[in-house]
Amino acid sequence: MKIFADKLSVTLREALLPVYLISGDEPLLVQEACDSVRSTARAAGFAEREVLHCDAGFNWDTLYHEASALSLFANRKIIELRLGGKPTDKGEAIIEWLERKDPDQMLLVVTGKLDKTLLNSAWVKKIDTLGAIVQAPAVSAAQMPRFI
């Protein structure tokens, strides 16, 4: 399901999905969308959050380890992937995580604006099927007064 950041609160009231991909040019809107998802997840019992920064040297096995690690303090957790670049060949790791379908874990993927190639990639399509793609486009000059 594709939604814009300004419609996210309505979607979150309806249901909390197992995966969210939040992307966009406007860092503040991306951050606010992430905060909304985290807040709703916290209210639903997702008390733990693990943040993984995925840059060029990221070991994708870390995602598997986090998914299989048991927590001493919380039953439910959010795994947040902050993508620094394009996970072109490693999108398979995200697909494998999604296929696990653990109701006690949620995946929050945060990245910059997705180009057409990435929007058509298998891992993004899988997220679109199982969760939501939240787009936070740049604020136009006409929208700026409302934005401020």
Predicted feature residues:
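Conserved beta/loop motifs at nucleotide-recognition and modification sites
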Residues: 1-148
